[in-house]
Amino acid sequence: KNEEKEKLYLLSEIVFEIDNQNNLNEKKDNINNSINEIGFKNSANIYSISDSSKFGGQIGWVSEKDLSKKIFTQINNLKVGEQTLPINMGASFLILKIDDVKFEKKLIDVKQVLSNKIEIETERQLQRFSKIYFNQVKINTNINEL
């Protein structure tokens, strides 16, 4: 077992959608003005479509290892109290605010981590093989209508 320091972020979010790309700047400006006037939590209550909006957008403590690369690159250089620009998440946009940062010492069971990674990789490969097999069956199947 190894000991490792883990960086944790206390995050809050505002998740919003737009009708079309032209509305992005307008919506972003409205949200930023609201954050400046009434604060991030109240703005999350108003604008966020996420369930976390009921709690002022607060997500809780999140390990940097649990963040996607896209999100990590956006928040990595921010200081406590700062927020990201809107991050495109496909169907919606995400604004994250760092409320606090802390480091925790964590004991790492190397065997367990290796076992988890092997299991994840095996599952990924099985999914890939099953898709390939399904596509072959789909190609070779003829459906005759009456």
Predicted regions and their residues:
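Well-structured core secondary-structure elements of compact alpha/beta domains
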Residues: K1-I35, I46-K69, I95-Q125
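Short, well-structured alpha-helical segments that form the helix of a local strand-helix-strand
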Residues: F40-N45
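Glycine-centered loop/turn motifs
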Residues: Q74-N76, G81-Q83
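Short, low-complexity, Pro/Ser/Thr/Gly-rich segments in the mature regions of secreted, periplasmic
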Residues: N135-E145
